């Protein structure tokens, strides 16, 4: 009876291991299908790398009584470092309520340029000026 019991224990362990391997294999397939795992290690877009990057942004503009038009301007896209840590002792001595110290940077437009566009409207041609990002950088996050 001892051999039969140990055989069952081995079979149960084997089933548990194969289930674990199956789950891992399924996760790898899902990950690959979704595109989260890139075997080459390369990013599909420049903005997927850490930092703040200049990217083109195309949209259709509709102005009442004017012909709709498409325009491409530059925007900033990416991600910057942010974190929160328990406040250092010196900070707590100065302000006991300041328990957490946070640092954050946001992807932001640093400089812009004007893009003039001639738009055909019912009352004639109008010149409308759009802003386009010239440069981008990680900077202090602001509330607006």
UniProtKB/Swiss-Prot annotation:
Keywords: Disulfide bond, Hormone, Secreted, Signal, Toxin. Residues 1-41 form the signal peptide. It is found in: Secreted. Expressed by the venom duct. The keyword Disulfide bond applies. GO terms for biological process: cell surface receptor signaling pathway. The keyword Electron transport does not apply. GO terms for cellular component: extracellular space. Disulfide bonds join 52-107, 66-121, 76-136, 80-138. One of its GO terms (molecular function) is toxin activity. Its main location: secreted. Belongs to the glycoprotein hormones subunit alpha family. Heterodimer with GPHB5; non-covalently-linked. This is Thyrostimulin alpha-2 subunit.
